[in-house]
């Protein structure tokens, strides 16, 4: 994942509309590949592969430009998303045993979830109101992050993988 630092007021919105993710300790982010290997199957070799993968990539920038929705989900749209899509696709190709979102979605679209399991149209309007004046927000990406479920319903950062530069 790409952890999005300096996340206020996004975290305030998430506390109201993405309650479960916040309670689980999942930071504001853009998913690169999920699900990934279970914690008990995460080996030193696999971590080394991830380090090498991210170390071979260059950092990039994007803006969270606007708010959009899917049924039940409200999210911030990163633009441009080409570097994110390239990184996601390269991870998918490198680790085909873990298809993105279990292979449920034919196309994986980069996004930063702001609300889930919600009435998307009404929640989107409320989130847009609350984020007025805060979008677009520019982000510089210099690392990928591996999050792991270390206890039932508790997540934490396992490792941060710096990009080449």
Model-derived regions, located:
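Portal/gating segments that form or line small-molecule/metal binding sites
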Residues: 64
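Basic, often amphipathic N-terminal segments
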Residues: 1-61, 81-143, 155-165
